[in-house]
Amino acid sequence: MKVLIELYDKDTLKNIVAPLTLRPDRVVYLYDKGMDDRDAFRSLVTCFQKNMPNIVVEDIPVDISSVKTLCAAVCRVAERYEAANCTLELTGGS
């Protein structure tokens, strides 16, 4: 798998299971633009770099209260990396 699109969750375990299991080349997290504390996200990146040194981790702020905004963000990522290369993981998201 090339690109995993994931909804960032406050629960760290929900953020790492799919990438560590599926081992994508790139993981793109859509996170709440109102999130102030980025320490957990930095720790997540460190975890991936230790376990999958070649992975690319991206984070995109979105208004998580708007389904329309979330859908538009997912579509932009899918267009950027070609939809056939993308997998959307929906079990997380706070």
What is each PLM-predicted segment?
Residues 1-86:
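Long, low-complexity, Lys/Arg-enriched
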Residues 90-94:
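Active-site histidine-anchored catalytic micro-motif
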